[in-house]
Design a protein with these regions (language model features):
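Catalytic-loop motifs flanking and including active-site residues across diverse enzymes
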Residues: 1, 60-64, 180-186
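Active-site-proximal alpha-helical scaffold in enzymes
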Residues: 1-23, 66, 72-101, 187-197
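Flexible glycine-/small-residue-enriched beta->alpha junction loops
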Residues: 6, 16-71
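A short, structure-level motif marking secondary-structure boundaries and short turns
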Residues: 52-54, 78, 177
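Flexible glycine/proline-enriched surface loops and loop-helix/loop-strand junctions
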Residues: 53, 69, 73, 169-175
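N-terminal extracellular/periplasmic Venus flytrap/periplasmic-binding protein-like
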Residues: 81-197
Length: 198
């Protein structure tokens, strides 16, 4: 939406644009492919659209976690590096929250929890006290090898200058170093220089 907003301003179609986006992974529905015309006699299947529509590589027909494993193989990224980066991200977020870095940009949302109304104003995904050593104990989330339901693919692209690692072909993506499943929303006002001056 930010790109489209900027294009609108550059093209002269608008002077001020409110750009926004939402993510509601927890409410992603299950799809029943046979539901429209009937399953007839026998069992049917429910498909998790969070995975099939949001986390699925439509070109290669496998989970995006497998894509991450493939990229790690190609670029020689180790499990240790992935865990260190993930822990660093969590630590920076924790420090920013404690320092109130983004409080002025956060709009609290009232949420009904049972009979009470709770003001939701702190991102619930970050975890305090995360260390690379701690998350290194987690098992990989995506099986590898010929028995894997998400087999790795053979790449014709091999970047030069990348060092082979002992982790190649091993499980590296875990619940701790992968993207989280969460909800959120953000909005931003873009304006031309003339509009700002007005």
């Amino acid at each position: 939406s930010m790109i489209e907003g900027a294009r609108s301003i550059l093209a002269g179609d608008a002077d001020v644009v409110v750009c926004g986006g939402t993510e509601n992974m927890s409410a992603a529905p299950y799809a029943v492919p046979t539901g429209r015309y009937g399953a007839r006699m026998g069992h049917t299947q429910m498909i998790d659209t969070m995975i099939k529509d949001g986390l699925w590589d439509a070109y290669n027909n496998y989970h995006m976690g497998t894509t991450a494993e493939n990229i790690a193989d190609i670029w020689g990224i180790t499990r240790k590096e992935m865990d260190e980066f993930a822990a660093s991200s969590q630590q920076k977020t924790e420090a920013a929250q404690k320092a109130g870095k983004f409080e002025a940009e956060i709009v609290p949302v009232p949420v009904k929890v049972k009979k009470d109304i709770v003001e939701f104003k702190v991102d619930e995904f970050p975890r305090a006290g995360v260390t690379a050593e701690g998350i290194s104990k987690l098992k990989g989330a995506f099986p590898v090898g010929p028995e894997s339901p998400n087999p790795r693919v053979v790449h014709t692209f091999e970047p030069t200058g990348i060092q082979e690692t002992d982790d190649k072909g091993q499980q590296r993506v875990t619940a701790a170093n992968a993207s989280g499943i969460n909800d959120g929303a953000a909005a931003l006002v873009l304006a031309s220089g003339e509009a700002v001056e007005k």
